[in-house]
Amino acid sequence: MTPANPTLSNEPQAPHAESDELLPEIFRQTVEHAPIAISITDLKANILYANRAFRTITGYGSEEVLGKNESILSNGTTPRLVYQALWGRLAQKKPWSGVLVNRRKDKTLYLAELTVAPVLNEAGETIYYLGMHRDTSELHELEQRVNNQRLMIEAVVNAAPAAMVVLDRQHRVMLSNPSFCRLARDLVEDGSSESLVALLRENLAAPFETLENQGSAFSGKEISFDLGGRSPRWLSCHGRAIHIENEQAHVFFAPTEERYLLLTINDISELRQKQQDSRLNALKALMAEEELLEGMRETFNAAIHRLQGPVNLISAAMRMLERRLGDKAGNDPVLSAMREASTAGMEALENLSGSIPVRMAESKMPVNLNQLIREVITLCTDQLLAQGIVVDWQPALRLPWVMGGESSQRSMIKHLVDNAIESMSQNQVSRRELFISTRVENHLVRMEITDSGPGIPPDLVLKVFEPFFSTKPPHRVGRGMGLPVVQEIVAKHAGMVHVDTDYREGCRIVVELPFSAST
């Protein structure tokens, strides 16, 4: 509004023929029908003009507001500081914008988003104040509702025990909750969310790729991490795609979607640990039975091994005597006694062989070597504590599956750990440390079991794998079948086992097994 139109009225004026004389009327009608409430006041805030939107929002008619002060709209709850800021800006001949709590004629309240600007004459003096405001009560309510919902959602997400993370197409972390950050500190060395995302992608493999490429959700995908000296972690992972419309202006009429990935990770370690404890109790009974059967097999095989020699000697002597006696062999009492002894010996060998407990055939299945090692360490805890042995276990964080028999591989590890404990239990061994590690090397799963015992002499590193050969004193139990059994099991899994001759501070047994191509 300019001083060119000092007389303000709500009455329409008749248009003139000349276009220059139409402009003030057009301008007045424009202000009158503007969708925003407009009022013009004198320097004391007395209302000189109010347009239709002003009357609609406030509920006052023209005759009720003209000449009245703008304070008739005040509810008295707006802080005085706001008004001081308003008049301070106007005194500087600068516009002011802010929000006031106004009151309508019917006493209802509304939020007025107000802009007040000084109207200056040609001399730069303020002659009027122009006020424009709109009712933003509904918008404010919606904004507050959205903000409150955001705060509630954030509170729920932040308090949730499940770890949550939102990723963009480049796998960058867009949003994560405190549980995810704590999980990152527990699982990855640098404790960063990005490193944990990379680890999850690697372990989830196919489900993550399907989610990323096709948007197909997955649920209840379990992964586990062995952390060496700490308890293992079992995680149940869920993933889904979130489709969000592009926010940029140039796609307003042709909106496009951006795909984000939401991962939710539940820590089920406590549940799995309880299940694992129950399983270990059953496993103890099973392995005790297997050890009993293995002891029986060892005893029978040792007896057969010992008896086979004399029987073979009798048979050889009998054949020599038969050739020497020729035709008189049939009546020779010594030869007859030898035949009876040979027959009795062969029958005894057959009976012993038939009495050996038969090993049950195992079906091949994917086996996690880290899990078997942890089970064996748990089963041997009492022995390790009794001998004062410190265990240092360094498992690979992600180890491929090994196809084969779970029970036989567990038995193989148990034999090696038992041998290490036996070796370090000698009185002259003061430093008692058992080091176990797993890693992937040359497309093989490599397991090293190292003890600080007296070690194996270089000239015996091959002989120790022979059946019934033992470096233990005669009075010690277990006469030389541990490593041969280990070698047999490893060979059945197309692997290799050997003694590391370069290691001089004890004994290091190295087992290498091929892993499944599908992992």
Swiss-Prot record:
GO terms for biological process: nitrogen fixation; phosphorelay signal transduction system; regulation of DNA-templated transcription. PROSITE patterns: HIS_KIN, PAC, PAS. Residues 94-148 form the PAC domain. Signal peptide: none annotated. The lineage of its organism: Bacteria, Pseudomonadati, Pseudomonadota, Gammaproteobacteria, Pseudomonadales. This is Nitrogen fixation regulatory protein. Its cofactor is FAD. CDD domains: PAS (cd00130). Required for the inhibition of NifA activity in response to oxygen and low level of fixed nitrogen. It catalyses: ATP + protein L-histidine = ADP + protein N-phospho-L-histidine.
